[in-house]
C-alpha cells in the first residue's frame, strides 16, 4: 500500500505527465499545414476546415486577409489559427494581389463568399480578420455587404487609402490617376463608406499600436472607430502603447482578440 506521501507524489506526477502530453499534442497541431488550396475565378484561395463538425449546421469561419503568395498567412498566424481550429472554426482567404480594395478585388472576394456559403456550407456571417493592408481588402467588401458579416477584427489594419498606400501608389490598382482617385474616394475609400456598418451595428475590434509609423492610429483605426461610433455603431480599439507596425508576438497571441473572434464566429462559444 502506498504511503500518503508516495501516493501524492505519484498522483502529482501523473497530472504533470498528462498536462505535458496535452501541451505536446497542442504544439504538434499546426492548423496552417492542414489548409486546402482551391481556385476561385482563377485566383488561389484556401480553406482550413476542422473535423467533427455538425453536418446539420453551417460551418463557422474566419475570413483572413491578406492572402498573398506563400507568405501570408504564415507562421505568425499559427497560434490564432490553432485556437480557431481547436474550437471548430474554419479559416479561409483568397489572393487578390495588391488590390488595395479595388472593385476587381471586391468582386473576387464576393466570388469566394458565394462559393463557400453556397457550395461548402460555410456560415453566411463570417468574422473578418484583417491584418495591415488586409484591412483595406476586407473593409472594401464589408461596407458593401453589411448583412453578410458577423463581426470585424483587425491587427493594425489599413482603413484609409490616403494614409496607406497613399493615392499616388494606390491609383494604378484602380486604373485611375491619383487625382481621379481622390475625386472618387467617397465610393472607394472604406473609411468614407462606413454608414452601412454603423447602421447594422457590426461589432468591430482592432488592435493598434500608438507608435505605428506605417499605418498610424489616427487616420486609420481611430478615425474609423470615431466615425462608426458617432453614427451609433459598435467599434472598439485596443491601443497597445509603444508598439508599431511590426511582428511583435503579442499581436498574434492576444487573448482579447481571439475571444472576440470566437464569440462572433461561433456564438455558442460565448
Model-derived regions: residue spans:
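Primarily recognizes the serine-hydrolase "nucleophile elbow" in alpha/beta-hydrolase
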Residues: 117-119, 124-172, 176
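Alpha/beta-hydrolase active-site loop
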Residues: 100-121
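The feature captures the conserved acid-bearing segment of alpha/beta-hydrolase catalytic domains
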Residues: 162-230
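Conserved alpha/beta-hydrolase
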Residues: 81-100
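C-terminal catalytic histidine-bearing segment of alpha/beta-hydrolase fold enzymes
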Residues: 214, 218-270
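Short, surface-exposed "cap/lid" segments of acyl-processing enzymes
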Residues: 51-83
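A domain-start/cap signature at the N-terminus of enzymes
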Residues: 24-57, 170-172, 266-270
Amino acid at each position: 500500500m502506498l504511503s500518503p506521501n508516495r501516493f501524492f507524489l505519484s498522483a502529482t506526477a501523473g497530472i504533470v505527465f498528462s498536462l505535458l502530453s496535452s501541451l505536446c499534442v497542442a504544439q504538434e497541431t499546426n492548423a496552417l499545414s492542414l489548409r486546402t488550396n482551391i481556385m476561385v475565378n482563377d485566383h488561389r484561395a484556401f480553406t482550413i476546415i476542422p473535423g467533427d463538425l455538425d453536418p446539420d449546421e453551417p460551418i463557422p469561419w474566419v475570413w483572413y486577409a491578406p492572402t498573398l503568395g506563400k507568405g501570408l498567412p504564415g507562421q505568425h498566424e499559427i497560434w490564432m489559427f490553432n485556437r480557431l481550429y481547436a474550437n471548430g472554426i474554419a479559416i479561409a482567404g483568397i489572393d487578390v494581389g495588391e488590390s488595395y480594395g479595388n472593385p476587381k478585388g471586391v468582386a473576387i472576394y464576393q466570388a469566394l463568399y458565394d462559393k463557400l456559403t453556397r457550395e461548402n456550407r460555410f456560415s453566411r456571417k463570417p468574422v473578418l480578420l484583417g491584418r495591415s493592408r488586409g484591412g483595406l481588402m476586407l473593409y472594401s467588401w464589408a461596407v458593401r455587404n453589411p448583412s453578410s458579416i458577423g463581426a470585424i477584427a483587425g491587427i493594425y489594419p489599413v482603413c484609409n487609402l490616403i494614409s496607406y498606400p497613399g493615392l499616388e501608389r494606390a491609383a494604378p490598382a484602380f486604373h485611375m490617376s491619383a487625382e481621379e482617385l481622390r475625386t472618387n474616394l467617397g465610393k472607394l475609400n472604406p473609411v468614407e463608406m462606413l454608414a452601412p456598418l454603423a447602421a447594422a451595428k457590426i461589432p468591430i475590434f482592432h488592435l493598434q499600436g500608438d507608435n505605428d509609423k506605417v499605418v498610424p492610429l489616427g487616420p486609420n483605426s481611430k478615425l474609423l472607430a470615431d466615425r462608426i461610433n458617432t453614427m451609433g455603431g459598435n467599434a472598439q480599439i485596443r491601443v497597445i502603447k509603444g508598439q508599431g507596425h511590426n511582428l511583435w508576438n503579442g499581436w498574434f497571441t492576444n487573448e482579447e482578440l481571439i475571444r472576440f473572434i470566437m464569440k462572433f464566429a461561433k456564438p455558442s462559444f460565448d
